Amino acid sequence: MYIVQIASECAPVIKAGGLGDVVYGLSRELEIRGNCVELILPKYDCMRYDHIWGLHEAYLNLWVPWFGAAIHCTVYCGWVHGRVCFFIEPHSEDNFFNRGCYYGCDDDDMRFAFFSKAALEFLHQSNKRPDIIHCHDWQTGLVPVMLYEIYKYHGMDTQRVCYTIHNFKHQGIGGVKTLWATGLNREAYYFQNDKLQDDFNPFALNYMKGGIVYSNAVTTVSPNHALEAQYTDVGCGLGHTLYQHKDKFSGILNGIDYDFWNPEIDRYIPYNYNQEDFEQKLYNKKALRERLLLQAADKPIIAYIGRLDNQKGVHLVHHAIYHSLNKGAQFVLLGSATEAGINAHFRHEKQFLNNNPDVHLELGFNEELSHLIYAGADMIVVPSNYEPCGLTQMIGLKYGTVPIVRGVGGLVNTVFDRDYDQNLPPEKRNGYVFYQSDNQALESAMNRAIDLWYQSPEKFQQLAIQGMKYDYSWNNPGKEYLDIYEWIKYKW
């Protein structure tokens, strides 16, 4: 099958968050399964050119219709760890992608409306006719709209679109200007509730809503998050639209790259290990203590790795530190905060706890240290307020680090409570789950984990090994996406 991914990010060249990892990981898996996969991306001035091999001008005269005229673009081609990537560079006074950043400009709505138009125009002018066009997040939400309202009438009538929503919080809001720029034009037609009209502002257009309405299949990043988006405020106002299109909407878990996150081959940890020689994990625990100057003691290490913000349940992260100490455990934190108040709070906590031999707070991010923490910790807490998919718990499971998670989003689909999950036999359970976003619920789950570590170390080790048996690579998601591609290719 011939698949084109259109996205605003692809790791490691363009990475602002998890989107880039997903686009790369899925593309790689689809190619491993024998498909032809190409990616279309903006040519940002600030992307990591050192990760592109053989970058060259591939299409010199791409003229993209824009506001009744046309903008000249050059399309470059290069290989990113074996993936064929096309990078679109517009030559205009707007300098859409020469801003020194990926996002955060006042005209982001127009920047990515243009990118969506340019991607389709490139496919059209170069006579590329993929079976599937896979778009990601609001930045490419207009691709299916323009495909079916404009390009279908120019010979692109067999392409089918899968649209994946990674983050409902950012939906892409435009207006009449978007319609006139892209050639969609008909205001009265698109400003309708069953088309692109924003549900909060009737005078605005919602790019993500357009992607939902016009795509042949819509996915988000976990089955439980798909339900939350339809029936709770997690959908950020798009719940009704998603429910109307529920027959084509589903959730597929993201995967993690086991070439990078795998204790058996991890180059960042001093002692490699797997399920059979799990005792090597204890040596990594010793190495972690030595690096972070924690005291050598017969205590479990509980970790938190991730952003320090409200989405991640920062108030519970704070409580987990002190509850761990009260329960006779050690605590390691590796995280960063962009919000000034949260950053100041944790800097104060770091200073206050500086002389405590059982805690270490590392503010910032350190790739190498994150691997050692996963390998050396006994448990990892993920107390998120909402979590579309979550990768931390998947990595923890692979490293035999028992996750303690709040039962939201993709955490529900990946962590199964040792004591209370009645849907799985005991040998399939792999962690601890709590549901309320309060200290008492967190404490209850942490207590059960810590008590098992102290009272039945053999059972705790068995729980950790059970978690290592789960496969959260891209293998299963790749198959599920191919099933969706086949479905929309032959149904529509």
Curated annotation (Swiss-Prot):
The keyword Chloroplast does not apply. It comes from the Bacteria. ADP-alpha-D-glucose binds at K15. It catalyses: [(1->4)-alpha-D-glucosyl](n) + ADP-alpha-D-glucose = [(1->4)-alpha-D-glucosyl](n+1) + ADP + H(+). GO terms for molecular function: alpha-1,4-glucan glucosyltransferase (ADP-glucose donor) activity; alpha-1,4-glucan glucosyltransferase (UDP-glucose donor) activity. Its EC number is 2.4.1.21. The keyword Cell division does not apply. One of its GO terms (biological process) is glycogen biosynthetic process. Pathway: Glycan biosynthesis; glycogen biosynthesis. Pfam families: Glyco_transf_5, Glycos_transf_1. Keywords: Glycogen biosynthesis, Glycosyltransferase, Transferase. PANTHER family: GLYCOGEN SYNTHASE 2-RELATED (PTHR46083:SF1), PTHR46083. NCBIfam families: glgA, PRK00654.2-1, PRK00654.2-4. Belongs to the glycosyltransferase 1 family. Bacterial/plant glycogen synthase subfamily. Synthesizes alpha-1,4-glucan chains using ADP-glucose. This is Glycogen synthase 1. It comes from Trichormus variabilis (strain ATCC 29413 / PCC 7937).
